[in-house]
Amino acid sequence: SVVQNSLFNRRIHTLTDIEISGPLRGNAAMVTKYSPNGTRTRGTINNCASGYTPWGTYLACEENWAGYFGNSNPGTRSSNEQASMRRYGVRATVGNGRENWNTASEVGQVGEPFSRWNVGIVGGTAADDYRNAANTYGYNVEIDPFRPNSTPKKRTAMGRFAHEGAWVGPVEAGKPVVFYMGCDSRY
C-alpha cells in the first residue's frame, strides 16, 4: 500500500525544478527567464517508459513534448530557428498547442508558470522571456528515488528526440555502459 507521508512518496511534474546536465548545460540555447545562466529548467512532461541505471536511478523519458509550445510571433525567429522548431513539431503560432497552455499567460489568467509555453520573442534577451524553453525538453530525465531531496537532471549527452525509453545494455567490467533508446515521434 501507499505510505502517504513517506520521504520516498515524491511527485516530479511540469513545475519541478530540474537541472540541465551534459554538453548543453549553460549553453546559450538553454537560457530562459527561469534560468538566465542556462543550467536549470522548470519541469518535465510526457514521460514514457522509465529505464533504470546500474547505479540505482531511473530515466524518465520525454516523448511528444513539442506540441505543448506555441509561438506568439514566429516572424521574429531566424530561418534556422524556424526550421529547428518545425523539425521537432513546435507550433508556429500561439493557440495551436496541445492544451493551449501557451495562451494562458497572454490573457492574464495565470502568469509566470505558463509563460514558458510561448516560445515567441517577447523580451529584449533570451533571459527576459521563454524563447528557448522548448530547447530544454526532449531529454532523458534522471531521477534518484532513494534521495528524495535530490534534483532531477536532464541528461543532454544522451541526445534529444521523442524518447520512448532508455534501457541499459549488457554491463561488462571495463567496458562503457551503453543505453538503447527508442523514438516515439509523431510526424
Language model regions located:
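Conserved small-residue
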Residues: 1-187
